Amino acid sequence: MQFRASIAAAAGLFALANARIYGIAFPETVKAGDEVEAVITTENYIQAVQDIAIAFGIATEASAYPETLGNALGSFYLGPEESNTLENITETVTIPAGLAPGQYVVAAGLYSLYGASSSPTLSHYNVTVTVGNVTSETYVGSQR
């Protein structure tokens, strides 16, 4: 009987788990015109976070300015279904067909509400990728 109570208590603690998004990952090399999986990476966190939406963009290294997206690749509603989860989130984006081979920056902007008072934040992430002849299966992640 005491064992069941312990399991019930542990299950209650797991239900209270909090997590946040801390970055993105993208194929190291992408082919223009391909659909690719953008990975939104998550981790344990001390308080609840409501992730509202994320948008992805791509720009040449020369035109990539801090906290900008460049040409939009897509935006996605996250909401309660994809907030406070320890499982990475995957969204599909299409690389523009007309991109010339070379180095590009893929950026993301994330809108979230933090804590009991729902403090709004806008977080920015980016990774450098190569546009080439094939989309790789190796992913590169944003730095913290």
UniProtKB/Swiss-Prot annotation:
Location of region: BAK1/SERK3-binding: 103-132
Disulfide bonds: none
One Gene Ontology cellular component: host cell cytoplasm
Keywords: Glycoprotein, Host cytoplasm, Secreted, Signal, Virulence
InterPro entries: Nis1
Subcellular location: Secreted; Host cytoplasm
Signal peptide: 1-19
Keyword Nuclease among UniProt keywords: no
Pfam families linked to this entry: Nis1
Residues annotated as glycosylated: 88, 126, 133
Reported function: Secreted effector that induces necrotic lesions in Nicotiana benthamiana. Interacts with the host receptor-like kinases (RLKs) BAK1/SERK3 and BKK1/SERK4, inhibits their kinase activity and suppresses INF1-induced pathogen-associated molecular pattern (PAMP)-triggered immunity (PTI) in N.benthamiana. Also interacts with the host receptor-like cytoplasmic kinase (RLCK) BIK1 and inhibits its kinase activity, thereby inhibiting PAMP-induced ROS generation. In PTI, phosphorylation relaying by RLKs and RLCKs is critical for the initiation of downstream signaling.
Similarity section: Belongs to the NIS1 effector family.
Domain notes: The C-terminal region from residues 103 to 132 is important for BAK1/SERK3-binding and the host cell death suppression.
Protein name as annotated: Necrosis-inducing secreted protein 1
Naturally occurring in which organism (per UniProt): Colletotrichum higginsianum (strain IMI 349063)
Protein encoded by which gene: NIS1
